Amino acid sequence: EISACLVGSEMCIRDSFMAGFKTLPNDSTGVCHIIEHTVLCGSKKFPLKEPFVNLLKGSMSTFLNAMTAYDWTAYPVASQNDKDFHNLMETYLDAVFAPISVLDPKPFLQEGWHYELLNKDDDLTIKGVVYNEMKGAMSSVDSQLCELILKRMYKDSGYGVNSGGNPKDIPNLTYEAYKEFYHKHYHPENALLVLYGKMDILSQLEFIDKEYLSYYKASGQRLKIEEPKPLIDLDYEEDYAISNSEKVENNSYIGMSFALPKSCLLYTSDAAD
């Protein structure tokens, strides 16, 4: 039996589903972010180039998205129509458990990174959806400062790297490393599947088990994420790039951060007081 974590509730006027996975990276190559993009580029049951885009155009969804955080990746959907909800849930389940991207490198090259040369006399450039997205994100000084703070505070932890990917590191990600990370983390024993709404929960769980979970063998090794220990040496200074039109004077940034315990511990402490 597969010991996936399943949560169900019947309290909402719209039906919701989420598949979430613990995905703490070891580097800033953006593997978590790239997997989030590529699994939505076609799957075994839905071998379309961009089923996510088709769902955005053709479904009655009230919410449809995917997101990568520091140590988890989630795929939530919601709809007020029963049939539409089931289609959304099935599409997302097939995307995370049977993506084409682990069999065909094209989605990885498209969403992650690839070399591009349109004419023989042009300079060789790097392109990719996630690569370009993170170039824009990391052009912000605020983003650079945030990344630097985490890098310094959690130097020897996955929390000290950029889970979205740093443009300087993304080209270091190989297709083999991408597949290895997917197979290790996208397993039912490392998943949290959530059903929420006014639905027949048992029939939905039976569908999920029959179509997906039953094909996996239990490994008995649920991934554990250890709470990081922040460094005490907090004083650090680093330069950042500015444009030719900017002045160096009065253009410095300073950040102050505090390492706090888990929010549930803070809540318990406040309640005790």
Residues covered by each model-derived region:
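Short, small-residue-biased leader/transition segments that mark boundaries at the very start
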Residues: 1-7, 11-13, 270-273
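Non-catalytic beta-strand/loop surface segments
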Residues: 8-10, 14-26, 45-83, 105, ...
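Active-site recognition of the HExxH zinc-binding catalytic motif
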Residues: 29, 33-37
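Catalytic Zn2+-binding segment of zinc metalloproteases
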Residues: 38-44
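Helix N-cap motif at beta-to-alpha junctions
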Residues: 81-83, 198-201
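Hydrophobic or amphipathic alpha-helical targeting/insertion segments
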Residues: 85-87
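A common structural junction motif
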Residues: 93-102, 212-219
